[in-house]
A protein has these predicted regions:
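NTP/phosphate- and nucleic-acid-binding module
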Residues: 1-479
């Protein structure tokens, strides 16, 4: 049995040997993605897409609970429309893919394959918004977008990726700002409760904010070995896009006004976050809330009378409260154990003839590998309890890892020394000047992750220039 497991997992590079290769191995060996014949594009395989479907389902329920509606915008954007908002087009220009012909006929105007959909939403709003009575308009779209990245990695940075993008317009700036905050909190709640990933909430610096936004807010997660991953963003646009695209409405005082706008998005990058936060050298460890299979039943000595029948009976019962799979394939149990561990299934049940005689089975948690004997009649409480405990432990381990890898500095020498010796979050004060932010990158290799909402007073001055500090910033090395 041990040899079967070794054969199954030996192709996975150990995390401590080469974390980047380990990540790639997990993506392919766990059958999440397959590289396509188009460079930078991947195929989301059924298991990978099933994870994304659960992310979609759980997020979508949250969006609809706050009044948002799903829509679908065209995938192509006329160049003239994209150019109406200068900051946006300048921000995305290097990454835009263009359609220049339809069949064999050249197009009169180039069409951009959407890198994001602000322009199409604004164009739509300009046609359907008339009165303050139409507001707010709370829209969300599930789709893929294309950005011509130079360096790609599955889930983290691909030329096409799947995401949701919310776009809303409001009568007042206060309502739009409240929407921006609400959606950021939605992402944070989802990341921490469903994905078991602790996040830092904060505001991006002007250098790091979304092109064209007045303010960008973010949730930043720390991966296992200390690198940062931006895991969801929420943007407040003010009325800048409304003015650029002539989106107006008749206000309560019968004057023509511009609505205030937001956008917010999260993507399949979240799957990368799950892999790098929770995975181990044997594969994925999936949080139960988004696991395609929450419980796998593995028959032991399946050829013995009654074993498969009992497993089928258990699968039917468990299926009433959990996503369950009975692996009745002809592979050896040891191979199955290794396969489902690689795929990160939270709970495994082992059922053999002796177990059936004793009215029990073996329950194994994916994260601890600890085995416990559970009476069949107690599974309905034992399985949910095991999944709840696993989710809590995943979160607690990730939080402990973040705390262990978070440092504070008050001088540039301290920053450089910490950055040289450790990978993690470094907290410092900051004067607010772009030059000092760029010096952090040039001298210490760190980018600003955010100005956390939970501010601390570490010192009175900026460590770069010595001028009075305005905010505490979290710095790090990001994917």
């Amino acid at each position: 049995m041990a040899n079967d497991k070794k054969k199954m997992v030996e192709a996975i590079t150990a995390q401590e040997v080469d974390f980047a290769q380990w990540y790639t191995d997990i993506c392919t060996k766990a059958e999440l993605v397959e590289y396509s014949s188009v460079k930078g594009f991947v195929v989301l395989r059924p298991y990978g897409y099933a994870i994304w479907e659960n992310i979609q389902k759980n997020l979508d329920a949250r969006f609809k609970a706050t009044g948002h509606e799903n829509v679908a915008m065209p995938v192509l954007i006329p160049e003239s429309l994209l150019k109406k908002e200068g900051e946006l087009v300048n921000g995305f220009a290097p990454e835009v893919a263009w359609v220049t012909a339809g069949g064999s006929d050249p197009l009169e105007e180039r069409l951009a394959v959407r890198p994001t959909s602000e322009t199409m939403f604004c164009d739509h709003f300009s046609h359907v918004l008339h009165s303050y009575r139409d507001l707010p308009m709370l829209y969300n779209q599930w789709c893929s977008v294309v950005r011509w990245e130079k360096s790609t990695r599955p889930f983290l940075r691909t030329r096409e990726f799947w995401w949701q993008e919310g776009h809303t317009i409001h009568e007042t700036a206060e309502e739009a700002k409240a929407e921006t905050e609400q959606q950021l909190n939605c992402y944070a709640d989802f990341a921490e409760h469903d994905l078991c990933i602790p996040v830092v909430k904060g505001r991006k610096t002007d250098k790091e904010k979304f092109a064209g936004a007045e303010a960008t807010y973010t949730i930043e997660a720390m991966m296992k070995y200390g690198k940062a991953l931006q895991s969801g963003t929420s943007h407040y646009f003010g009325d800048k896009f409304s003015r650029a695209y002539d989106v107006t409405f008749t206000g309560r005082d019968n004057t023509l006004q511009y609505p205030f706008q937001t956008s917010w998005g999260a993507s399949t990058r979240l799957i990368g976050a799950i892999i790098m936060t929770h995975g181990d050298d044997d594969g994925l460890i999936l949080p139960p809330a988004i696991a395609p299979i929450q419980v796998v039943i593995v028959p032991v000595a399946a050829h013995k009378p009654g074993v498969l029948d009992k497993c089928r009976e258990l699968a039917a019962e468990i299926g009433q409260y959990a996503r369950v799979k009975l692996d009745d394939s002809d592979k050896q149990p040891g191979w199955k154990f290794a396969q489902w561990e690689m795929k990160g299934v939270p709970v495994r049940l082992e059922v053999g003839p002796r177990d059936i005689e004793n009215g029990q089975c073996v329950l194994v948690r994916r994260d601890t590998r600890e085995k416990q004997f559970v009476k069949f009649e107690e599974l309905a409480t034992a399985i949910p309890a095991a999944m709840e405990a696993l989710a809590k432990d995943l979160y607690d381990r990730a939080l402990q890892n973040r705390e262990n890898r978070t440092y504070s500095a008050t001088t540039m020498d301290e920053v450089k020394q910490l950055a040289k010796e450790h990978t993690g979050f470094i907290k410092t004060m900051w004067c607010g000047d772009l030059a000092c932010e760029e010096a952090m990158k040039a001298d210490a290799g760190l980018s600003s992750r955010c100005m956390p909402f939970a501010q601390e007073h570490l010192s009175d001055v900026c460590p770069v220039c010595g001028k009075p500090a305005q905010k505490m910033v979290v710095w790090g090395v990001a994917y």
